[in-house]
């Protein structure tokens, strides 16, 4: 029977016992050490070198090591767990005996917390518990815990995936090649989520299988992986190359094995001949997924067919491996496991070639940012309140919906729009804050691991969920997120368990320690009620007796501090008794003597207890106390511990059974409730982001599947615009693909893309409004081309998870695939040179765009920069032609200006060329970045422009610096600059127009001025003209003296804002030329006065003429802003 294979066999192998009888302490210790090292060695061979065995010794779990035995690096746990490591092997040998092993112990009460820490740091932990019958002590293995198979009671927000992969190398008959067929299974033990996927290479795309496996690993980021490679022939070099290609060094806890000649190399035997046999698979899966009843009803379907695996042989093998791996750790985790969800390749936007990392979607480690709070797109748009919502958002970012899920995408836009209207999202957000991880608590219900206190919390989360539903139930759009009949069942489920449990009493039980009061309601379980009645009677005896004797003496006794006059104590032999101080003992005896033969005590339950006063015994105790013993009381109370133990055991058994039953009976409904909370949290986050950051609702015009395109107005980069504090982010208009004429007609009047002369664009045969599949973008470094290109890819991802995008208008048709090849992301793990890797990835991209090119977006940054000029131009030109011919949409950046003169490129009528303009500012010795897309290729020798800024002659610079200081009247005054009232990062130090600096001799007040006047801003601080900008950010503030400030408000000076340059933001303003010359001559006269001690009159005149000339011809006055 499979049940025997899974359950009985597991326990017989894993729960091995060790017995020893009473003996000398030294002999027992020697036995323990020998046993420990045997088990440590055995389990390390099975689970790997990072395996730790802990055995229970009394109240501690202990581990041992010497320099050669056990886990020799045991001392590394000391800083990790903050527990002392006891070193013993450095002590001298005594009586010919070696020193005892080093020791590390964890208190039993703290094992759960420390186990979680060890597992999260990649250890596999094996626990042995201690049991005793009084004569012998037994120790047995109670669990094996690894990162992917540990069901923690500590709530985690991230997914916790275990990955199982079967890679089979298949020999081909039609060609002399071996191709990869791969089956993949994923499970999150903490939630029960189960995913399977199967894919293959083909003779035209041999690397597809491994590339797809890499993509899945990058997407789901498993905490533990088991990979079996089944090659045709054993070739160590080929095996090494596979491991390098999969970049396994980037992941933790990877177990890589080889299967060959019907034999695997792992100690667990995860893959055997039986794993490939259909009958064995059906029996095994029927047992795991409890399909026996279903099989009776569906005699025509096997378990493989029910699970959709009948045509997915490789996925079935990977699933078998994973289930066996879980069983070898903790078989109970297989209980109530969800049916595997088949990953449908065409239902998700394929983020190929590691686009997730290259576009900084999630937790990027290649984005050079100094703001640790924002390192990815996820950091910007995550406004979720619950762990489920957070996981739902992250899962969608990693697996956006594809064109085939267009209806769902549009539905999400409508949901967010409805949430924004009337600010409904704010009310829902308030309730979502009261909900934590329902999904993981449901999983703990499913496996019977939940404790009473957790169910109380779950009940509170349900109540908050009810309140969320009450907010949306009358909204015709949002209420469709969850069917009404599902929520009706949810309410009925709550009514049902509240009839069974008193959830308030549950809150007192964080575990199944001693329970003296049942939280099951009376009448539910007769056996519990009977035990509870006995316990209640005994507790009434204790309480009433204490109250009676205290009441007859309390007015005459001395009470010491907060101590009770009569203290209740107990022991196993005598049950409960009272203790009293010696001084109060006399008073109590006197009061008892006044009573007649029988003392009648009224109990709280309405009965009476008769106590003979002669049966009350006083016995002296140490420390000035006296024991007051009553036989009638002891007769009952001595039974209390055993009754409490029996009650606790019964409650635990019945509670776990109820939990598993509730979950099994309402499994589908509970799953949909979890989905409802996750999705509404996800949508509320989208509404908050759209409202707060002024994102726009994307528009999908066609209901049918058509070639993909995008048309964005004022598109911004999600991350970069949030980091722009000193200068305004410059948005751009982007158009790719065959944009419908209706959009061009709509935007014809207000299109911000500059018209281009026929001569300039003739070679590309392109006119605005016609089909444009691709863009080639030229610019020098730092100009923002990567930011511009990434903004397109990120906007598509946001749009295809159903979120609004950072633009003022965004029209598009969803894509099926997005590939990125961006500079600075070379990966040496694959064992290829930078250029070889680039060509390998380019080859894969071009090959995969051929199949669905019209629905593919490709982003390539500086392709072929790793080779010489002629080859580079030829490769880039050929790539542009290939992508254009298959109708894919793409943006390529390049430094190779000559490609536009290649005949094949000239002939492309669906390609457009742009550049990002930069200028060199001689006066300020800096490069000014325009950041705006301009038609045409721009200057081809901009490298010289950069060189003028970067290449310095020290002697020349020093001399220029001296002259510059004289010309700008740079007076050094040791005054502490003030900070602006509007923004503490702005130093009020110098007028940014006339460059006046306050002095102690003559002081004019400096003021902070809003470039966009405050009267032109909304009450929430947003600028009316540009609502995505805030009035008190540095980009909208300028320091002015009173004189210049008045000129600004009189219109004599017009401030345009700041321009981004290599030396920081520079102020751009215009003023009346005549007034400017007059002011300039006055400045020169002041300068001449400052040279009154100089004899070099020719130098003074030369400086004067130069300054006036500059003032006359300049349209900008650029002064670097100074910030705190």
Swiss-Prot record:
Record keyword Zinc-finger present: no
A single BP term in Gene Ontology: mismatch repair
Keywords (A to Z) from UniProt: ATP-binding, DNA damage, DNA repair, DNA-binding, Nucleotide-binding
Binding site residues for ATP: 779-786
SMART domains (alphabetical): MUTSac, MUTSd
Superkingdom of the organism of origin: Viruses
Gene Ontology molecular function, alphabetical: ATP binding; ATP-dependent DNA damage sensor activity; mismatched DNA binding
General function of this protein: May be involved in DNA-mismatch repair.
Family stated for the protein in its record: Belongs to the DNA mismatch repair MutS family.
Protein known as: Putative DNA mismatch repair protein mutS homolog L359
Organism: Acanthamoeba polyphaga mimivirus (APMV)
């Amino acid at each position: 029977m499979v049940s025997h294979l899974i359950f009985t066999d597991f326990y017989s192998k894993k729960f091995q016992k060790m017995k020893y009888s009473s003996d000398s302490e030294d002999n027992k210790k020697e036995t323990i050490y020998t046993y420990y090292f045997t088990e440590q060695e055995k389990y390390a061979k099975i689970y790997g070198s990072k395996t730790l065995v802990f055995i229970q010794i009394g109240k501690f779990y202990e581990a041992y090591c010497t320099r050669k035995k056990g886990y020799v690096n045991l001392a590394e746990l000391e800083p990790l767990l903050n527990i002392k490591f006891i070193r013993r092997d450095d002590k001298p040998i005594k009586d010919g005996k070696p020193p005892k092993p080093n020791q590390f112990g964890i208190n039993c009460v703290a094992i759960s917390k420390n186990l979680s820490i060890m597992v999260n740091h990649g250890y596999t932990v094996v626990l042995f518990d201690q049991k005793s019958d009084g004569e012998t002590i037994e120790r047995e293995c109670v669990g094996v815990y690894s990162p992917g198979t540990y069901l923690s009671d500590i709530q985690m927000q991230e997914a916790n995936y275990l990955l199982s992969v079967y890679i089979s190398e298949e020999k081909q008959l039609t060609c002399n090649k071996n191709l990869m067929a791969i089956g993949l299974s994923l499970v999150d033990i903490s939630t029960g989520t189960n995913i399977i996927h199967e894919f293959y290479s083909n003779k035209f795309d041999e690397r597809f299988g491994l590339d797809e496996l890499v993509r899945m690993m990058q997407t789901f980021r498993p905490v533990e992986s088991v990979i079996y490679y089944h090659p045709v022939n054993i070739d160590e070099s080929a095996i090494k190359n596979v491991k390098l290609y999969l970049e396994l060094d980037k992941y933790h806890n990877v177990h890589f094995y080889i299967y060959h000649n019907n034999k695997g190399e792992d100690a667990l035997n995860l893959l055997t001949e039986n794993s490939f046999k259909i009958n064995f698979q059906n029996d095994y899966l029927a047992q795991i997924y409890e399909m026996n009843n279903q099989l009776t009803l569906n005699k025509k379907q096997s378990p493989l067919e029910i699970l959709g695996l009948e045509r997915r042989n490789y996925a079935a093998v990977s699933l078998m491996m994973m289930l066996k791996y879980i069983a070898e750790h903790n078989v109970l985790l297989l209980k109530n496991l969800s049916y595997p969800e088949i990953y449908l390749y065409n239902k998700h936007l394929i983020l190929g070639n590691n686009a997730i990392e290259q576009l900084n979607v999630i937790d990027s480690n290649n984005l050079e940012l100094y703001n640790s709070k924002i390192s990815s797109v996820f950091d910007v748009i995550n406004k979720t309140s619950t762990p489920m919502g957070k996981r739902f958002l992250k899962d969608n970012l990693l697996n956006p919906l594809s064109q085939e899920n267009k209806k769902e995408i549009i539905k999400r836009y409508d949901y967010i729009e409805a949430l924004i209207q009337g600010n409904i999202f704010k009310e829902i957000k308030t309730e979502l804050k009261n909900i934590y991880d329902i999904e993981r608590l449901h999983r703990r219900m499913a496996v019977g691991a939940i404790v009473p206190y957790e169910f109380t919390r779950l009940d509170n989360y349900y109540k908050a969920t009810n309140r969320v539903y009450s907010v949306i139930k009358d909204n015709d759009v949002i209420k469709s997120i969850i069917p009404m009949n599902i929520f009706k069942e949810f309410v009925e489920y709550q009514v049902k368990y509240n009839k069974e449990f008193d959830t308030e009493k549950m809150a007192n039980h964080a575990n199944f320690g001693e329970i003296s009061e049942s939280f099951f309601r009376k009448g539910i379980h007769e056996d519990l009620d009977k035990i509870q009645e006995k316990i209640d009677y005994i507790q009434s005896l204790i309480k009433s007796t204490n109250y009676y004797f205290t009441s007859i003496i309390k007015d005459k006794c001395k009470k010491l501090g907060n101590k009770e006059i009569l203290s209740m104590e107990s022991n196993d032999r005598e049950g409960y008794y009272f203790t009293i101080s010696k001084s109060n003992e006399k008073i109590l005896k006197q009061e008892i003597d006044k009573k007649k033969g029988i003392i009648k005590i009224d109990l709280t339950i309405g009965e009476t207890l008769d106590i003979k006063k002669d049966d009350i015994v006083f016995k002296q105790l140490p420390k000035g106390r006296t024991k007051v013993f009553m036989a009638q009381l002891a007769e009952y109370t001595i039974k209390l511990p055993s009754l409490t133990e029996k009650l606790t055991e019964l409650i635990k058994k019945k509670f776990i059974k109820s939990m598993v039953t509730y979950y099994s009976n309402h499994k589908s409904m509970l799953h949909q409730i979890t989905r409802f909370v996750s999705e509404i949290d996800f949508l509320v986050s989208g509404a908050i982001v759209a409202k707060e950051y002024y994102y726009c609702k994307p528009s999908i015009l066609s209901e049918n599947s058509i070639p993909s395109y995008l048309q964005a107005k004022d598109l911004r980069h999600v991350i970069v615009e949030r980091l722009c504090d000193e200068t305004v982010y410059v948005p751009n208009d982007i158009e790719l693909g065959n944009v419908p004429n209706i959009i061009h007609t709509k935007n014809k009047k207000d299109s911000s893309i500059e018209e281009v002369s026929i001569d300039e664009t003739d070679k590309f045969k392109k006119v605005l409004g016609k089909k444009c599949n691709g863009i080639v973008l030229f610019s020098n470094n730092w100009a923002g081309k990567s930011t511009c290109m990434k903004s397109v890819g990120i906007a598509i991802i946001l749009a295809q998870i159903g979120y609004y995008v950072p633009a003022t208008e965004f029209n598009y048709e969803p894509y099926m695939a997005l590939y990125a090849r961006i500079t600075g992301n070379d990966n040496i793990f694959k064992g290829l040179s930078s250029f070889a890797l680039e060509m390998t990835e380019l080859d894969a991209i071009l090959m995969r765009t051929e199949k669905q090119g019209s629905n593919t977006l490709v982003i390539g940054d500086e392709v072929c920069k790793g080779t010489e000029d002629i080859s580079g131009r030829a490769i880039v030109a050929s790539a542009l032609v290939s992508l254009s011919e298959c109708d894919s949409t793409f943006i390529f950046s390049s430094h190779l200006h000559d490609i536009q003169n290649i005949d094949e490129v000239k002939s492309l009528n669906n390609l457009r060329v742009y550049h990002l303009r930069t200028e060199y500012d001689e006066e300020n010795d800096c490069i000014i970045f325009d950041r705006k897309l301009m038609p045409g290729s721009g200057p081809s020798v901009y490298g010289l422009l950069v060189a003028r800024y970067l290449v310095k002659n020290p002697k020349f610079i020093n001399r220029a610096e001296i002259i510059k200081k004289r010309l700008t009247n740079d007076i050094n005054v040791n005054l502490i600059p003030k900070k602006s009232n509007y923004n503490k990062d702005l130093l009020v130090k110098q007028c940014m127009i006339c460059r006046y600096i306050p002095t102690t001799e003559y002081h004019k007040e400096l003021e902070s001025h809003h470039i966009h006047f405050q009267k032109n801003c909304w009450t929430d601080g947003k600028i009316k003209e540009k609502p995505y900008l805030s009035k008190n950010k540095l980009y909208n503030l300028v320091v002015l003296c009173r004189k210049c400030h008045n000129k600004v408000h009189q219109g004599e000076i017009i401030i345009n804002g700041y321009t981004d340059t290599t030396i920081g933001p520079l102020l751009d303003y215009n003023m009346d030329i005549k007034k400017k010359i007059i002011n300039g001559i006055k400045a020169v006269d002041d300068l001449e006065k400052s040279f009154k001690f100089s004899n070099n009159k020719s130098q003074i005149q030369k400086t004067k003429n130069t300054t006036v000339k500059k003032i006359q011809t300049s349209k900008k006055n650029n002064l670097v802003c100074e910030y705190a």
